[in-house]
């Protein structure tokens, strides 16, 4: 398997930041009440992750090891501020919905973890691809959790899409079924914990099924050699 296929496999499935590493759980559980919020936060996180990996890879040879973590945090904070200002200017409704969890991307362990573990030790191209795959894997988990909670909670999909994509996106809202009142368990944090647990369990079931279908290689027992003492 090539390096890039391995990076894609690691980010999207085997070492997924949300399902395996369980990083960034605070925003993951807090803002995934709707698919729109989940997609918005996922895209913002992915942009910061790609940008931080690129910049860290560029400066890795010029930053002393003793101060690398503060420098990485400053780079991430600058990128988060830029993304925050962009969303504030062009998607103000989404900016209000995400609230404090948008600037808290700075403290997301996924970003600082990839900067330290990968970007600081690899080329710009590989670091960019790693950031893309890790960010995409995290975004997919956010979207699946957000979509399931929104459907169960209020029977819709892409509700409030205009906050992310503009006025034209109002027509994207899909009414799955009509509900008189929202299913609060799905919309509140307890529902997020239950949904996340089910996603992790589903991934484990799939992994176990794939592993069970793999042909088992039987190791041959080492042959015993009889040593006869000769006088």
Curated annotation (Swiss-Prot):
GO cellular component, as recorded: plasma membrane
Segments traversing the membrane: 18-38, 39-59, 69-89, 93-113, 127-147, 182-202
An individual GO BP term: electron transport chain
Cell location: Cell inner membrane
Keyword presence, Zinc: no
Record EC number: 7.-.-.-
InterPro entries, A to Z: NqrDE/RnfAE, RnfE
Keyword terms, alphabetized: Cell inner membrane, Cell membrane, Electron transport, Membrane, Translocase, Transmembrane, Transmembrane helix, Transport
Its membrane topology: Multi-pass membrane protein
EC class of the enzyme, as a word: translocase
Pfam family, one: Rnf-Nqr
Functional summary from the UniProt entry: Part of a membrane-bound complex that couples electron transfer with translocation of ions across the membrane.
Subunit architecture: The complex is composed of six subunits: RnfA, RnfB, RnfC, RnfD, RnfE and RnfG.
Entry similarity comment: Belongs to the NqrDE/RnfAE family.
PANTHER family named among the record's database cross-references: ELECTRON TRANSPORT COMPLEX PROTEIN RNFE, ION-TRANSLOCATING OXIDOREDUCTASE COMPLEX SUBUNIT E
Official protein name in the record: Ion-translocating oxidoreductase complex subunit E
Species of provenance: Shewanella piezotolerans (strain WP3 / JCM 13877)
């Amino acid at each position: 398997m090539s390096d890039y296929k391995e990076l894609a496999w690691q980010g999207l499935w085997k070492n997924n930041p949300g399902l395996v590493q369980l990083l960034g759980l605070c925003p993951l559980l807090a803002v995934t009440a709707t698919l729109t919020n989940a997609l918005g936060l996922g895209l913002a996180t992915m942009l910061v992750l790609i940008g931080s990996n690129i910049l860290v890879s560029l400066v890795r040879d010029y930053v002393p090891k003793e101060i690398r973590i503060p420098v990485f945090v400053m780079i991430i904070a600058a990128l988060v501020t830029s993304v925050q200002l962009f969303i504030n200017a062009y998607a103000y409704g989404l900016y209000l919905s995400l609230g404090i969890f948008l600037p808290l991307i700075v403290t997301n362990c996924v970003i600082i973890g990839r900067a330290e573990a990968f970007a600081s030790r690899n080329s710009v191209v590989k670091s960019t691809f790693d950031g893309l795959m890790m960010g995409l894997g995290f975004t997919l988990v956010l979207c699946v959790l957000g979509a399931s909670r929104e459907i169960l909670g209020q029977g819709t999909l892409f509700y409030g899409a205009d906050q992310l994509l503009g006025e034209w996106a109002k027509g994207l809202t899909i009414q799955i079924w009509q509900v008189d009142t929202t299913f609060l368990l799905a919309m509140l944090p307890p529902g997020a914990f239950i949904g996340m647990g089910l996603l992790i369990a589903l991934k484990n079931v799939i992994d176990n099924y794939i592993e069970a279908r793999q042909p088992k290689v039987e190791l041959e027992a080492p042959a015993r050699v009889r040593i006869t003492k000769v006088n």
